[in-house]
Amino acid sequence: MKRKQESKGAGEKRQGAGGRGQGEKKQGKQGRQGRQGRQGEKSPVPSPQSPIPNPQFTTPNPDEWLQIGKIVSAQGLSGEVRVYPDSDFPERFEVPGTRWLLRPGQTEPQPIELLHGRYLENKNLYVLQLAGVENRSQSEELRGCMLFVPASDRPELGEDEYHVVDLIGMEVFLQASGDLVGAVVDVIPAGNDLLEVSLHEPVTSDKKPKTVLIPFVKAIAPVVDLQTRRIEITPPPGLLELGSGV
């Protein structure tokens, strides 16, 4: 199974792949390690020169945008930027075309042209050259900005592949008994991705719900039904006792 991530409004992932997800990631075949990406193009190019107004983000409409990455630092002196990917599709960062840039304090991403990009091995980062960003000072101003593509550019996935955003909120049941375990609240990257599941507790409980990490592999999560929003698991003994939280 694969997770493909590109968080909606925030990213896409695949089941059994690596990568984190408020972004675009795909849930992939179990045991496969994922890299990130896929691309969107069009629109004019804004000049990314104004300083970042403040550190607060307003999340764009998740039905309209997929977050693919975050600019984390400048790279060199020629205006390149380093991007932490929220996408399992390398094309998002390596194929020229239009992307959308959201600055802190803004509410709508603005189009900007990707000229070229490359992957930094062993760092899980991409280095991008964006149009209009020609020196280190300009690239430093983009630190903390988020990159998006339109939700309409969401790629088709293969068998046993899932968008992380579709997994969030799905209910998890024990396959053998049908008992409700809880609901997926996050997908955490690892050699095989982990579903973070908030355990079901009576509504009268005043305690913070406990969570448990469940490997997102076919052997443990054999049923993932997007239509009914249901995941069935066959956890090994002791797995559900390893919850965290109070």
Curated annotation (Swiss-Prot):
Q: Does the keyword rRNA processing apply?
A: yes
Name one process (GO BP) from the record: rRNA processing
Gene Ontology molecular function, alphabetical: ribosome binding
**Pfam families attached to this UniProt entry:** PRC_RimM, RimM
Task: Indicate the principal place this protein occupies in or around the cell.
Answer: cytoplasm
Comp. bias intervals (Pro residues): 45-54
Description of its domains: The PRC barrel domain binds ribosomal protein uS19.
Superkingdom to which the source organism belongs: Bacteria
According to UniProt, the name of this protein is Ribosome maturation factor RimM
Subunit structure of this entry? Binds ribosomal protein uS19.
Gene3D superfamilies recorded for this chain? PRC-barrel domain, RimM
- Can the keyword NADP be found in this entry's annotation? no
Query: What is the purpose of this protein?
Result: An accessory protein needed during the final step in the assembly of 30S ribosomal subunit, possibly for assembly of the head region. Essential for efficient processing of 16S rRNA. May be needed both before and after RbfA during the maturation of 16S rRNA. It has affinity for free ribosomal 30S subunits but not for 70S ribosomes.
Q: Which family does it belong to?
A: Belongs to the RimM family.
Ranges of biased composition (kind: Basic and acidic residues): 1-15
Question: Region Disordered: start and end of each range?
Answer: 1-63
The transmembrane residues are none
Q: Where would you find this protein in the cell?
A: Cytoplasm
